[in-house]
Regions:
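Short N-terminal signal/transit or membrane-insertion segments
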Residues: 1-5, 36-42, 137-142, 154
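Short, hinge-like loop/turn segments at secondary-structure boundaries
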Residues: 1-5, 87, 126-128
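Intrinsic structural disorder
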Residues: 1, 26, 100, 105-109, ...
Length: 154
């Protein structure tokens, strides 16, 4: 349910119309893929392990064009590239951003947006704002509550 609520929130922030979202929480694996594997049936696409948002995130790179579909590794909100919510594995997330940056892709394709080209400044910004501790949809509310409780004690 959190994923569905989050998808609705992202869609509203992007000005998209509301629509019914529902999918099974139990997914069936068609192919087990690992870092550097070719996509079955698409030899010119390479799998990249890019965990951090979740522990199993994958990106895929079209080798001839050096274009990478990164899924939810980044989102663009108000003309800024930022980490997604949640970032469950912050160290892995930062390593994934550095991995993609090191590949010097021609462009990145976002799950929630269009094809974009990041500058070195964009990558630097993402790494600066990337959380250092796990960050979920509940983290801001928890932090605000802690600040309120500490203020009342003091």
């Amino acid at each position: 349910l959190v994923d569905i609520a989050l998808a609705a929130w992202v869609a509203s922030r992007m000005g998209k119309a509301k629509r019914n979202l529902w999918y099974s929480p139990h997914l069936k694996t068609d192919y087990a893929l690992s870092d550097q594997d070719s996509l079955p049936g698409f030899d010119d696409w390479c799998v990249l392990a890019t965990p951090g948002h979740t522990d199993r995130d994958l990106s895929v790179m079209h080798l001839p064009s050096k274009r990478i579909y990164i899924g939810d590794l980044l989102v663009k909100v108000k003309d800024r590239f930022i980490p997604p919510i949640p970032v469950n594995y912050p160290e892995q997330y930062r390593a994934s951003i550095l991995k993609v940056q090191a590949l010097r892709p021609a462009s990145l394709m976002l799950a929630h947006g269009r094809e974009v080209m990041l500058t070195e400044a964009n990558y630097a910004h993402v790494l600066t704002v990337a959380p250092r501790k796990p960050f979920t949809i509940w983290t801001p509310a928890k932090n605000k509550l802690q600040r309120l409780l500490l203020r009342k004690k003091g």
